[in-house]
Each structure stands twice: as structure tokens, then as C-alpha cells.
């Protein structure tokens, strides 16, 4: 394990031609080779190493262009097959480990990918060359680009957006908000008064989210910019993210990067040359500032980046200051003052005479303040300073502690990879077991499995488990919690599942009392074992559902039901505050990815970060256990007891 001083430090090991395409024997080998070749070694929060694929950022940008094309085509009334072809291409490219920028140079190899034909190859070549292509440009002459913002409003789909454009020329969120406030939507076909109110709620969510970015978006940007900065050569000692990204906040407003200057490269001439190099990063949209030791700019997606150039002696103080939070820093400064010291971004020093006491590392600053080192995720002034003073900080869970992933989807429902492919990818990440949890029948939009299909699916998973896959594959399901709190499968099917994950995908707007009763009914079902994405939020898009969390957690503790910390960057659900409540109430937690393709499996690092923010330790998260102990920790089903992971019939009924 790496020292905490190196937490979140990005380092790179790239060859001169890191993206050259070799000739592997098969597609799996090609995927593995590309992943190894294109990854950047990074240090994960808490001292765990993880690998970040640099090219994913470029692929994501290309995927975004295709996805926007699909949305514009659907608004334009194109047939489903046409716009779905662009959606599928976007999904494929988003998850692809190889660089599309390189693959377009070998069109025949590119056409080996499913759904990529001659026309799509031409589109991709044009996008790589110019950043856009003719079809999207044509559509954006017909519709304003802001019309895509309307699809972020939870109550509006492409057909309604198209209708509002044709009738009112409503092409912005402000246009739709005005129509709703004037009561002009409720009389329209397919809308109504309730829909109008939901649109106004969605507008408020949109306004609150403006200027915020998902954690993986900020992480992608930090990695790519760090690689660029390191190319400056000997002048750069290290590049370290700070701010809310380092603290693991669920969304990020801006990005702070600290560049430590190497010995012998601290003159203003060296600093100016490095600043000039930084501002040559190809993704910059606008330069905001260029000072003596700081450059600021915005990226093409609107994310503001502040890069500060530091000498080694000040690195620890600067990292502490710019990591935050503001509340944590204020509390530390108050403590320093009480000890006759002063703390700022340059050093910890004496109040009298300003004699330097510490500043090179965060550890030495905390030590001089008579505190244990406080991990970045805990720095929110919610009791961590008192805990550090009394040596009672938790030993936070780490990525290396994780042994399994308990929510993922295969091609049986809405996943993009087979069970075997998901298992192989999970094994490569170091997992010992996974649960395949395809959707139940109520989620028709996700190709949910009816009881007959699920029974066959369970048998298929059991058959795979007999093979030597190098990883245990558990038969699970993501079972919908229906409006009345009942589960979407019969007891007969639920009894056959090894892992029963329950979640809400409908009726999000029930009142607090009704939603609480719905959740309690699901938890009281003797087959329920895990509640997935428990508040149903979609970050920057949809507010959480409203229920009495105290009552729900009390019921989970009583019945042995675990709460999920969903690692998907759009969700990160449960949030840190509720995870800490779980710990305090003895509620078990699982960290799962909700993966829909093999590339999503690495998202587990985000779930670990949220768990750390919630003060969770290894013992609080049951999928840190080996598979037999994990199965024993799950709520036992009616008539079944577990000993050492083996199921045994019980004489008594119930829990």
C-alpha cells in the first residue's frame, strides 16, 4: 500500500507510441492489450492504486457527438432503427478500451465491431478529424443546440420536446419554464397539470446542477491534463488533484491541480515556460488567468480548471488548503491559533515571528497540530478533528478490500456483455465473486425477464458456475419494488436466487408517507436481501425519492437487509450522510457498480470513495468478505439457515 502522502497523485508511464494497434489473436486479447497499453497508473484515494484509461476521454467525446445525433434524430421524428443505430454506436465507443482515434486509421478493423458499417466509419473519421460531422451540423441548423438540455428534464422525452418545438418554438429550459409557469402546458395532449408541476420541479433540479460535473468527468479531465503537464519534462516533479475531487464529492464545480516544481526549475522563467505549456492543452476553450504561479482556464465542456505551480517546501500546506473543505480548514486554523500558530496555504508557522513549523507534507502539519492524519474524504468538519485528536478515526475501507460486485446486468436484460464477459472482466479487476442481477419483468424498457426467462437464466448461471471461470458467479436479480411494496417475482423464483437485490424504477413521486410504507413493505418481505440505489436519485438530473430514512434503516437493521452504495457516477447512492447513518445503526452495506458493460466494473472505486466519506470500515461492508462469509452475512431466506456459506433447511419459518 502506498503512503498517504501520495494519495491522489497521478503518475504516468507512457511510451512514445502508446496507442499503436498490434495484431492480437482474438478480440479478448485485443481488449486486454489495449487496456494495458493505454492506461495511466494513478493512486486511488486511501492508498489504493487503480488504472485509468487515458483514451476513454477521447472516446467519450466522440460518443457524446453520436449520442446527441441520436437525440436530435429522435426529436426530428426519425424511425427507431435509424436513431438507435447511433445510440448503439455511442454505447459501443463509450465502453471501448481502444482509441477510436487510432482505429479510424484502420477502417477494416473498425468494421469488425458490431454495428459499425461503412457509413458509420465515415462519420467517425470525420468526427476524429474535425470534432463534428455533416449530419449533426445539418440537424443543428434545424434545431438549437439548447434543445438537448430539455432532455435533461425528467418529465420530457424526445416526442414531447419535438411537440413543444413545433407548437411554441420552445428550445431552451427557460422557454419551457415560462410555458409551465403560465399554465400553458396543462391543456396540451399528453401533459396535464401534474406533468406541468413535475416539469417545474425538473427545471429547479436543472438549475441547481448547472455548472456541476459528475466525478468521473472531473477525474477524466484531471488525468488528461496531468499527462499533458508531465510532458513538460524535468521541470515537473508531480501533478496532484485537490479540491472536491480529492475529497471524493459526488459532483465537482471546478478542478484544482497542484503542480510541484522540480529542484532547479523554480525560477520565474521556468514557471512562465511551464505555464505556457499548460495553456497549450488541446481541450481548452478559454483562458481565464495567467499569473505568476497560477493559470486558469475552462474546458470545452465548461469545467473550470485552476492549476497552481508550487515549490516542494510549500506542497503539503498548499495541498491541505486547496483540498478543503472550507469548514475543515477554518476549524484547523482555529486550532492552530489556540496553539500559538498560524496556518495558510504556504506553511504552518508561529504567530510570533512567523517561524516556519511545517509545510512540506500534510502529515507533518497534522502532527504538529497534535492530530492523526485525516483522510481527504473525511475533511468536512463533521467530527473528524475530534476523532483525530483522540485517535478514534475509522480505518476506512479501501479498494483492495473489495472481493465482489453485487449488481450488474448482462445481455439477458439491458447489459451490453455476456455473463462470461462480465465474469472475466471482474476477475481481471481482482474480484472473487459477482452476482449477475438482470432486471425483473416490470422494467420492460430494460428487457426485464419474466418468470420463465428468469428460471432459465438461473439455470444458465448455475451451469456456468460449474466451469472453471476463476471467479464465483452468483445467480441474482434486480427485482422491482412495485407501487404497493410487493416484489416483482413470485416466492418460487425468489427462493431460487442466491442474491435478491430490490429497487425502485417507477412511481417516484409518491408522497412521503406512501413511499415510506412502500419501502417498509419491501424490506419486510422475507426474500429481500439488498436495497439497490435506495433513494433513486440521478445526480444532476433527478432528486431523490422522499421517505423516512430513519424508519427504513431501523427496518433494515431489524430484518438484516443490506443497503447498497451504488458506484455508478450518475447515482452514488446512498450518499455519505446516509452511509454514516447505516454504520451508526448497524445496517449492513454492499458496494456495487450497477454495471451494464465490462467498462463500468471499474466504477467500484467511486463507491469505495462514497463509503469512505460515510466513515465506513472494512467490517461495515459485507462484500469485503470471502464468498462463503458473504453469503452467510446475507439475510437468510424463509426456511433456510446458512452455516459457513452453505444453506441448510430450518425447521422454523420466517427470518
Task: Name each region found by the language model.
Residues 4, 9, 13-16, 29-36, ...:
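Short, low-complexity, charge-dense intrinsically disordered segments
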Residues 17, 23-26, 38, 649:
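Polybasic, lysine-rich low-complexity intrinsically disordered segments
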Residues 56, 248-339, 344-410, 418-430, ...:
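Charged catalytic cores and adjacent phosphate/nucleic-acid-binding surfaces used
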Residues 56-78:
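Charged, compositionally biased N-terminal leader segments and the immediate start
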Residues 70, 79-295, 302, 307, ...:
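Accessory alpha-helical DNA-binding modules that contact the DNA backbone or grooves
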Residues 476-479, 606:
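Active-site catalytic microenvironments in core metabolic enzymes, especially phosphate/sugar-handling
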Amino acid at each position: 500500500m502506498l503512503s498517504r502522502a501520495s494519495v491522489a497523485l497521478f503518475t504516468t508511464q507512457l511510451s512514445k507510441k502508446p496507442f499503436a494497434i498490434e495484431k492480437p489473436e482474438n478480440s479478448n486479447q485485443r481488449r486486454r492489450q489495449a487496456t494495458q497499453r493505454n492506461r495511466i497508473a494513478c493512486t486511488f484515494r486511501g492508498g489504493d492504486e487503480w488504472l485509468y484509461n487515458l483514451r476513454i476521454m477521447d472516446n467519450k467525446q466522440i460518443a457524446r457527438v453520436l449520442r446527441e445525433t441520436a437525440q436530435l434524430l429522435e426529436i426530428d421524428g426519425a424511425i427507431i432503427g435509424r436513431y438507435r443505430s447511433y445510440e448503439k454506436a455511442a454505447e459501443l465507443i463509450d465502453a471501448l478500451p481502444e482509441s477510436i482515434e487510432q482505429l479510424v486509421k484502420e477502417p477494416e478493423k473498425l468494421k469488425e465491431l458490431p454495428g459499425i458499417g461503412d457509413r458509420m466509419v465515415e462519420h467517425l473519421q470525420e468526427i476524429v478529424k474535425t470534432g463534428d460531422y455533416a449530419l449533426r451540423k445539418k440537424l443543428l441548423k434545424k434545431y438549437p443546440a439548447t434543445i438537448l438540455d430539455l432532455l435533461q428534464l425528467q418529465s420530457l422525452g424526445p416526442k414531447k420536446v419535438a411537440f413543444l418545438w413545433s407548437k411554441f418554438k420552445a428550445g431552451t429550459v427557460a422557454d419551457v419554464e415560462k410555458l409551465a409557469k403560465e399554465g400553458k402546458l396543462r391543456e396540451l395532449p399528453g401533459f396535464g397539470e401534474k406533468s406541468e408541476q413535475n416539469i417545474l420541479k425538473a427545471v429547479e433540479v436543472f438549475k441547481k446542477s448547472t455548472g456541476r460535473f459528475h466525478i468521473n468527468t472531473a477525474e477524466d479531465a484531471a488525468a488528461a491534463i496531468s499527462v499533458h503537464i508531465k510532458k513538460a519534462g524535468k521541470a515537473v516533479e508531480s501533478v496532484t488533484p485537490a479540491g472536491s475531487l480529492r475529497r471524493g464529492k459526488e459532483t465537482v464545480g471546478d478542478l484544482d491541480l497542484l503542480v510541484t516544481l522540480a529542484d532547479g526549475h523554480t525560477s520565474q522563467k521556468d514557471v512562465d515556460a511551464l505555464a505556457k505549456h499548460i495553456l497549450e492543452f488541446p481541450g481548452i476553450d478559454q483562458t481565464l488567468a495567467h499569473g505568476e504561479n497560477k493559470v486558469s482556464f475552462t474546458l470545452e465542456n465548461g469545467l473550470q480548471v485552476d492549476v497552481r505551480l508550487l515549490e516542494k517546501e510549500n506542497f503539503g500546506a498548499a495541498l491541505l488548503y486547496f483540498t478543503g473543505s472550507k469548514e475543515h480548514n477554518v476549524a484547523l486554523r482555529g486550532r492552530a491559533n489556540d496553539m500559538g500558530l498560524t496556518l495558510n496555504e504556504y506553511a504552518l508557522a508561529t504567530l510570533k515571528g512567523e517561524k516556519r513549523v511545517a509545510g512540506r507534507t500534510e502529515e507533518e502539519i497534522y502532527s504538529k497540530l497534535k492530530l492523526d492524519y485525516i483522510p481527504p474524504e473525511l475533511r468536512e468538519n463533521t467530527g473528524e478533528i475530534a476523532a483525530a485528536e483522540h485517535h478514534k478515526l475509522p480505518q476506512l475501507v479501501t479498494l483492495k478490500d473489495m472481493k465482489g460486485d453485487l449488481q450488474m446486468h448482462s445481455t439477458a436484460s439491458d447489459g451490453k456483455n455476456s455473463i462470461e464477459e462480465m465474469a472475466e472482466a471482474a476477475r481481471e479487476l481482482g474480484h472473487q465473486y459477482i452476482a449477475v442481477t438482470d432486471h425483473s419483468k416490470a422494467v420492460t424498457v430494460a428487457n426485464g425477464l419474466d418468470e420463465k426467462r428468469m428460471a432459465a437464466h438461473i439455470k444458465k448461471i448455475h451451469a456456468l458456475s460449474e466451469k472453471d471461470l476463476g471467479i464465483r458467479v452468483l445467480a441474482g436479480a434486480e427485482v422491482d419494488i412495485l407501487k404497493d411494496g410487493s416484489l416483482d417475482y413470485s416466492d418460487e423464483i425468489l427462493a431460487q436466487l442466491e442474491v435478491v437485490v430490490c429497487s425502485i424504477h417507477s412511481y417516484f413521486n409518491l408522497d412521503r408517507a406512501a413511499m415510506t410504507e412502500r419501502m417498509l413493505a419491501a424490506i419486510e418481505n422475507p426474500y429481500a436481501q439488498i436495497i439497490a440505489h435506495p433513494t433513486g436519485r440521478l445526480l444532476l438530473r433527478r432528486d431523490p425519492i422522499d421517505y423516512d430514512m430513519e424508519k427504513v434503516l431501523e427496518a433494515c437493521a431489524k430484518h438484516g437487509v443490506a443497503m447498497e452504495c451504488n458506484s455508478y457516477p450518475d447515482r452514488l447512492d446512498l450518499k455519505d450522510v446516509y452511509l454514516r447513518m447505516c454504520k451508526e445503526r448497524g445496517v449492513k452495506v454492499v458496494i456495487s457498480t450497477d454495471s451494464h458493460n465490462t467498462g463500468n466494473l471499474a466504477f467500484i472505486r467511486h463507491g469505495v470513495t462514497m463509503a469512505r466519506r460515510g466513515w465506513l470500515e472494512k467490517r461495515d461492508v459485507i462484500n469485503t468478505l470471502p464468498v462463503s462469509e458473504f453469503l452467510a452475512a446475507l439475510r437468510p431466506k424463509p426456511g433456510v439457515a446458512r452455516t459457513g456459506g452453505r444453506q441448510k433447511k430450518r425447521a422454523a419459518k420466517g427470518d
